[in-house]
Amino acid sequence: MAMMGVWVKIDEERVVQALQEAGEKLDSIEGEMALDLSSLRRIDPNALRAMEEFADIADTKGVKVVLRGVDVGVYKVLKLVNLASRFSYVS
């Protein structure tokens, strides 16, 4: 049975691993997945690559991804690398 929505907290110490785990859950989700990024104050190149891969998988599966609690600096980096428009945002 597919889940209608999932909320995942992303820890700054294990961003890549958490995004990979969230990506594995996308098979069983219909609708949307919310990622809580409130603990992230910076994002490194490996995490950006993982975000892009996660967005690709979500797009393929038709799952809307909502980012919650995004730091302004993190948002600016997502915008610079053209990832910001692939997500929705809530405070």
Q: Model-predicted segments: where are they?
A:
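Short amphipathic
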Residues: M1-K9
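Short, charged, intrinsically disordered terminal tails
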Residues: Y89-S91
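Amphipathic alpha-helical interaction surfaces in cytosolic regulatory modules
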Residues: I10-F87
